Amino acid sequence: MTTDNHQNDSVLDQQSGERTIDESNSISDENNVDNKREDVNVTSPTKSVSCISQAENGVASRTDESTITGSATDAETGDDDDDDDDDDDEDEDDEDEPPLLKYTRISQLPKNFFQRDSISSCLFGDTFFAFGTHSGILHLTTCAFEPIKTIKCHRSSILCINTDGKYFATGSIDGTVIIGSMDDPQNITQYDFKRPINSVALHSNFQASRMFVSGGMAGDVVLSQRNWLGNRIDIVLNKKKKKKTRKDDLSSDMKGPIMGIYTMGDLILWMDDDGITFCDVPTRSQLLNIPFPSRIFNVQDVRPDLFRPHVHFLESDRVVIGWGSNIWLFKVSFTKDSNSIKSGDSNSQSNNMSHFNPTTNIGSLLSSAASSFRGTPDKKVELECHFTVSMLITGLASFKDDQLLCLGFDIDIEEEATIDEDMKEGKNFSKRPENLLAKGNAPELKIVDLFNGDEIYNDEVIMKNYEKLSINDYHLGKHIDKTTPEYYLISSNDAIRVQELSLKDHFDWFMERKQYYKAWKIGKYVIGSEERFSIGLKFLNSLVTKKDWGTLVDHLNIIFEETLNSLDSNSYDVTQNVLKEWADIIEILITSGNIVEIAPLIPKKPALRKSVYDDVLHYFLANDMINKFHEYITKWDLKLFSVEDFEEELETRIEAASEPTASSKEEGSNITYRTELVHLYLKENKYTKAIPHLLKAKDLRALTIIKIQNLLPQYLDQIVDIILLPYKGEISHISKLSIFEIQTIFNKPIDLLFENRHTISVARIYEIFEHDCPKSFKKILFCYLIKFLDTDDSFMISPYENQLIELYSEYDRQSLLPFLQKHNNYNVESAIEVCSSKLGLYNELIYLWGKIGETKKALSLIIDELKNPQLAIDFVKNWGDSELWEFMINYSLDKPNFTKAILTCSDETSEIYLKVIRGMSDDLQIDNLQDIIKHIVQENSLSLEVRDNILVIINDETKKFANEFLKIRSQGKLFQVDESDIEINDDLNGVL
């Protein structure tokens, strides 16, 4: 197999350099044997595990484990200073809100874990954790930090750890890579690369592929696998190229060290002096290169190898990289599914190894023929965002809601800005890149926004011996236990668990600081309803003690209502206790004079004891706050307060108060008390008690109640008050109102009287109007009586038709004649007398005279009073009396208008015309008499001619029909006789 021409030794047969750990757990190096070679030690867990107790919160911890929360955290164990503890307590008491994170020292590890050696690398996998030390020892533990085994892997510091779940791999400064099995401690293999290894990654299915990727100080990204003969084949994926050094700009064959190698599917990304490089393995094409910024915090020419890059895979296609003070977010566009791998530092995920297929992906790399036919990459890498943070990053992990948790060392931005200004002014400042290692500074944890780097939260963490540590001595890892993520802050000789505060932690934090309301709010999710209520009660009682009535009013109902809603329906005793406490606090507020503020918050359901509601209403009534009194007797159910007591009190106040005018609206007057009393009576359906007050208050609701409840018979003595309810003026002015106004204003009372016609007779109502009502009520009586007209009950007013005629003659003359024509149960003579006494009732008199046969009197009235010839003629025609014609002619001969009207009447016989003409006096002046007579003659001639023609027609038709009749009579008839008829005739003749 051939590789790049510039590196002819990139493919090596390393079989001679590969060392296998035998069953005696010793390492044999055939090429480089150290005189002080150490055997690989596998320590039993029982030898390195100290006594461990289970904490109450479910996290395994030692009895001396310390928990630290706050913004300035001291996580050191052992000799804690009492004064420092007191200061911390005071600082925490000053805080209003709990910290976002809590810190717990991890003490499950062996006692000598940090004492004899210091940690150089970490791995937090899904099923186990691994810790490498500077002496080359690898500690494997469970996710609860219970030791699994300890292995002596290397002769010097372990710089990286990786796993595929079944196998683990470590890389060391000593230039070796150790790969071992988690199941078989004796199955350990060593690979010697002769140069320090900074990063190593196993294939996701290493057991089958035996493939891994590594890189280090040699500057090569090496893919190692076994060929078909079983020999190890190393393939350098990055070409060796000339580079310019920063000192002399001279070309050099030296490549910068590989600081980290990570893979996503069949993509590999690595970090070196050239920055961040993404490479597609099948095509060996570089997809993207992002140079490492040469300036960090005003320090020029910063070497990338001073800082370890830290990579975290957010999703299968998104990766975030933190390096120095820079953070990049990349997105990879995949065209097919593939498993991800990654390797390197403490935040690497164990199961993200590249999904290489040894027979396809790598085959293209091994075949020289295939290498000349490299395809086009089927994926791309995009930089989504890039920003810098004010810290040197030594670890990062995803947090919640598109946030990043970053471990590092803070940089004073103000100081750096000052330096920038001084540099602009020409002042000479020199900072060496090595100073950025921040040795002796305490590390910080920051939560920043993933897309813009905005700082959200900041904590400084004081770890053991931090004064002696630098940036590369810290590690940050993440592990998700079921659903709760945990973060681990590891230094060379200390380990701290970092967790987001749970609801229970928040609850305890608030309780310690007596912030009962906040504890009560969170308690909904962490404690029972009864215990939570006791905390809420503590908060309310504390407000009572402080006399903070405003806050008490604001929170009172919130606590009690939520408590009642959360209680079980069977918790009767607890519910009653809650209601009792609720009532007690409300009564305290009432006593303190905060009734107006607390009244709207007093619950209607569930109901408290009656005394609470009574106290509020008594207060409003005693202080003449009638509007408030009305508001709450309207809002509250009658069962909540002592209704009868308030009814009695209002009755007493009404009796004691002076009777105000109808227009009085002042609170405290008896009309206001009466309104509230009526309201209570009506809510209790005590209508008989409410109506007298409604009548006095002239409240129209009385009409509705009397109508619906059919109570009018009980209040006949107050019929005048009932009728006058809708009327606001003086009684004497009623007579001045028109019938229309009467019907409009008194519509409801009249309807009420009419609807009770079957229970209260018309006679009774008429009697009341005649004897008990003012004379001005006659119009109302008239409107009441005519209400019966055109109804099925019109017979009820038959006895009062004479009275109606008189009322019609006074108030509605236009309707009198139709009434006379339609009804017959009145005394005609009395009606004639009434109509005769009233001027202008001529039509009515004419009708009445005609009704009794006095047609001549009626006709005389028409002629003398109405002077209406046409009406007189129509009157005579309707009666059809010839004598009446004679009377009209004789009575009208001296009246030209009437004479002319009779002569122009075209439907009468000529005899009338002759009588009129003959009876006319010679001096009678009639307009157009000649034309009238001429017209009469023409009409008569025409009539005669028409009659003659009709006679001829009739005679002709008569003759025709007579001749036909005679002809028919003179003709014989033909009869058909059957044989049966002949036989019958013969028999009859024989008999005869």
UniProtKB/Swiss-Prot annotation:
Q: Which residue intervals correspond to the CHCR repeats? A: 753-901
Q: Which cellular component terms (GO) are annotated to the entry?
A: endosome; fungal-type vacuole membrane; HOPS complex; late endosome
Keywords from the UniProt entry: Phosphoprotein, Protein transport, Repeat, Transport, Vacuole, WD repeat
Q: Residues where Phosphoserine occurs? A: 26, 53
Q: Which GO terms describe its biological process?
A: cellular response to starvation; cytoplasm to vacuole targeting by the Cvt pathway; endosomal vesicle fusion; macroautophagy; piecemeal microautophagy of the nucleus; protein targeting to vacuole; protein transport; regulation of SNARE complex assembly
The role this protein plays is: Required for vacuolar assembly and vacuolar traffic. Acts as component of the HOPS complex that acts during the docking stage of vacuole fusion. HOPS is an effector for the vacuolar Rab GTPase YPT7 and is required for vacuolar SNARE complex assembly. It remains bound to SNARE complexes after vacuole fusion.
Additional notes on this entry: Present with 1170 molecules/cell in log phase SD medium.
- Repeats (WD): which ranges? 114-152, 153-192, 194-234, 240-280, 324-366
Xref: PANTHER family: VACUOLAR PROTEIN SORTING VPS41, VACUOLAR PROTEIN SORTING-ASSOCIATED PROTEIN 41 HOMOLOG
Q: Name one Pfam family in it.
A: TPR_Vps41
- Which gene holds the coding sequence for this protein? VPS41
As one GO molecular function, the record gives: small GTPase binding
Annotated Polar residues bias: 1-30, 41-56
SUPFAM superfamilies attached here?
Answer: WD40 repeat-like
Annotated region Disordered: the residues are 1-100
Subcellular location per the Swiss-Prot or TrEMBL entry: Vacuole
Q: Where is the composition biased (Acidic residues)?
A: 76-98
This one is known as Vacuolar protein sorting-associated protein 41
Family, according to the entry, reads as follows: Belongs to the VPS41 family.
Spell out the subunit comment: Component of the HOPS complex which is composed of PEP5, VPS16, PEP3, VPS33, VPS39 and VPS41. HOPS associates with phosphoinositides and the PX domain of VAM7. Interacts with VAM7 and VPS39.
